[in-house]
Regions:
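Pyridoxal 5′-phosphate
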Residues: 1-340
Length: 340
């Protein structure tokens, strides 16, 4: 296959580190058994890898002993499990940022049709590229928030949202706060230890540089969601009710040990750098992004869509070329220059 210059990292990061491929191959060949369903050595090994990967996520987000990590097949399923598990009966007003992915908006829309709550967008500044925190505080004063949902990083513009500040404002009204961190975790430092954020969603295959098939969410233990999916858990099997303690009740079915092993290897690799400098990857990405922006600005007919303050910007750049549809530009870059 011809060499490809891959830039589609907002969709999925590629290629992964060689250690990820090796770990997945090893898991597939050596211990791809059903974790938690047996006392034999291979099942224990699979369970250990799952437990260690949870611990890595907790270490990355500084949530040891204060939160739980739930694994799902993707960030999309994590959003669905959270929204499906919320008690909507008394929820009237939901605020979302204008930057939300359809993993949030379509799953939220399902419940809006059922329960009839109001969805309101968080206010933007005059240029329409960043949130206006003062306007948002007035929004909350006028219409009390019951739930606030935000992306940590926009998958379209690369804008890093002020999630902590807005979450703190929302907590003045006892709102539940959900953050979609699919484009952020592993790239943008985040501490959830004393955070006003209640649920933080992550995707294994994006900024964590793991494989497809593994995502999840981190939640503070004070919240118990209703169970949306039921099935086997490997424990208390005579009880037809789903377990209520810990994360097991949110993870029915056989865990994807091969994908989890890949995520485990990726986290191990990335945390080697992050322990020394929490901004290591973000700084490198910003340096490359600034170079890309400078070069694109030199091209006649290119329009860039950027936050005003580039310190609030991760490595995603949106642009148009005058006289071309975006799809046409993508096709030309692919066919003529092998740029994905």
């Amino acid at each position: 296959m011809e060499k490809v210059y891959y830039f589609d990292n907002a969709a999925t990061t590629f290629p992964k580190h060689e250690n990820v491929y090796k770990a997945m191959d090893e898991a597939n060949r050596d211990y791809a058994v059903n974790a938690g369903r047996g006392a034999y050595a291979l099942a224990r090994k699979a369970s250990e890898v799952i437990s260690e990967t949870r611990q890595q996520i907790m270490e990355l987000t500084e949530t040891e002993n204060v939160a739980e990590v739930v694994f799902t097949a993707s960030a999309t399923l994590a959003c669905n499990e959270i929204f499906g598990g919320i008690d909507w009966e008394k929820k009237r007003t939901v605020y979302v940022s204008p930057f939300e992915h359809n993993a949030v908006m379509r799953s939220l829309f399902l419940y809006q049709k059922r329960y009839g709550f109001l969805i309101t967008e968080l206010a933007l500044d005059e240029k329409g590229m960043e949130l206006d925190q003062e306007k948002i505080r007035f929004q909350f004063m006028r219409e009390k928030p019951d739930l606030v949902i935000m992306s940590h990083v926009s998958n379209v513009t690369g804008y890093i949202l002020p999630i902590e500040e807005i979450a703190a404002s929302a907590k003045e009204y006892e709102a539940i706060v959900v953050v979609d961190g699919a484009q952020a975790l592993g790239l943008v430092p985040i501490s959830l230890k004393n955070s006003p954020i209640d649920f933080y969603v992550f995707a294994g295959h994006k900024t964590l540089y793991g494989p497809f098939g593994i995502g999840g969410f981190i939640y503070h233990s004070k919240y118990r969601l209703k169970h949306m999916i039921a099935g086997g858990t490997g424990s208390d099997s005579l009880n037809l009710e789903m377990p209520e303690e810990g994360t097991v009740g949110y993870e029915p079915g056989s865990p994807n040990i091969v994908a989890i092993a890949g995520l485990h290897a990726s986290l191990e690799e990335r945390m080697t750098y992050l322990k020394e400098n929490a901004d290591y990857f973000l700084d490198r990405e910003k340096e490359m992004t600034e170079y890309l922006i400078r070069q694109l600005k030199k091209i006649f007919g290119v329009t860039l869509y950027l936050p005003e303050h580039l310190e609030n910007h991760a490595g995603i750049v949106s642009f148009n070329v005058e006289g071309y549809q975006a799809g046409e530009v993508g096709m030309i870059l692919d066919q003529d220059y092998h740029v994905a």
